[in-house]
Swiss-Prot record:
EC number: 2.1.3.2
PROSITE patterns, per database record: CARBAMOYLTRANSFERASE
Protein name (Swiss-Prot/TrEMBL): Aspartate carbamoyltransferase catalytic subunit
Subunit structure: Heterododecamer (2C3:3R2) of six catalytic PyrB chains organized as two trimers (C3), and six regulatory PyrI chains organized as three dimers (R2).
Keyword tags: Pyrimidine biosynthesis, Transferase
Enzyme class: transferase
Binding site for carbamoyl phosphate: R55, T56, R106, H135, Q138, L268, P269
One GO MF term attached to the UniProt entry: aspartate carbamoyltransferase activity
The organism's taxonomic lineage, starting at the top: Bacteria, Pseudomonadati, Pseudomonadota, Gammaproteobacteria, Enterobacterales
Pfam families named in the record: OTCace (PF00185), OTCace_N (PF02729)
Pathway assigned to this chain's UniProt record: Pyrimidine metabolism; UMP biosynthesis via de novo pathway; (S)-dihydroorotate from bicarbonate: step 2/3
Described function: Catalyzes the condensation of carbamoyl phosphate and aspartate to form carbamoyl aspartate and inorganic phosphate, the committed step in the de novo pyrimidine nucleotide biosynthesis pathway.
Length: 314
């Protein structure tokens, strides 16, 4: 079978068709069931985090190590030539691409990952987040988790809560779920942080049902997935942050009318938007969701480097 993702840049979730998403998710399930510690033996992968991260960087680097590859890179831009000496992103990527087989990259500027593809030659770029734009590997682990908990990716009722304006995870996840059939969206956010118009327009063009709401309680009984997000302090001015940070908080009591199959997800880090008491309910699944990032990222790395987890390595 031809691997359509071999040496492909993964910048946006829109770079992947439904069939390609399903291929990656199948591989992720295979890797979760049966680890392959030598699948990427002798490969070297750069972990280039021009913007600091905890979970995404550690998840990627764990995925790399558990596939037998080596990882080089940096956790932030402060001590790089780009940060200290004014080197351009183009030059940085041009040089790093001569050292490695793939580049995992996070950057604070929207479009930076796409720009990097112009200078990496045949070395694939995997976007680990570019500003408020896209976070495709978070979306892959979200899809994997939804499929794991619901047994499907079609006909899902999902609510997204909190910062829907700047939250790149909800943009990517909405676009991904729109590739599947019969999904229904509920968007719950303050007006200042509403889902961007271009996402709503995309849903309208596809004939996908969505609605806007002012409270979580209104929609709980309808949901399969409740996707919480934090208000991103780093992307708001202090006065705006203070006004909206406490508007949408999930408590255990809000889940009394929930379906038995409901799972609460969150891309993390959590601040105050999910009360600690929710952790002890059967609905909480955000820590397992984070753990699934290793398998989703392993599957994507294997695909872009031309390896099939379902077949033994030579």
């Amino acid at each position: 079978m031809v691997n359509p993702l071999y040496q492909k840049h993964i910048i946006s979730i829109n770079d992947l068709s439904r069939e390609e998403l399903e291929m990656v998710l199948t591989s992720a399930a295979a890797l979760k069931a049966r680890p392959q510690p030598e699948l990427l033996k002798h490969k070297v992968i750069a972990s280039c985090f021009f913007e600091a991260s905890t979970r995404t960087r550690l998840s990627f680097e764990t995925a790399i190590h558990r596939l037998g590859a080596s990882v080089v890179g940096f956790p932030d831009a402060d001590n790089t030539s780009l940060g200290k000496k004014g080197e351009t992103l183009a030059d940085t990527i041009s040089v790093i691409s001569t050292y490695v087989d793939a580049i995992v990259m996070r950057h604070s500027q929207e479009g930076a990952a796409r720009l990097a593809t112009e200078f990496s030659g045949q070395v694939p770029i995997l976007n680990a987040g570019d500003g408020a734009n896209q976070h495709p590997t978070q979306t892959l682990l979200d899809l994997f988790t939804i499929q794991e908990t619901q047994g499907r990716l079609d006909h899902i009722s999902v609510a997204m809560v909190g910062d829907l304006k700047y939250g790149r995870t909800v943009h990517s996840l909405t676009q991904a779920l729109a590739k599947f059939d019969g999904n229904r969206f509920y968007f719950i956010a303050p007006k200042a942080l509403a889902m961007p118009a271009h996402i709503l327009h995309m849903l309208e063009e596809k004939g996908i049902a969505y609605s806007l709401h002012a409270s979580i309680e209104d929609v709980i009984p309808e949901l399969d997935i409740l996707y919480m997000t934090r208000v991103q302090k780093e992307r708001l001015d202090p006065s705006e942050y203070a006004n909206v940070k406490a508007q949408f908080v999930l408590h255990a009591g809000d889940l009394l009318q929930a379906r038995a199959n409901l799972k609460v997800l969150h891309p993390l880090p959590r601040v105050d938007e999910i009360a600690i008491e929710v952790d002890h309910t059967p609905y909480a699944y955000y820590f397992q969701q984070a753990g699934n990032g290793i398998f989703a990222r392993q599957a994507l790395l294997a695909a872009v480097l031309g390896h099939n987890p379902d077949q033994p390595t030579s």
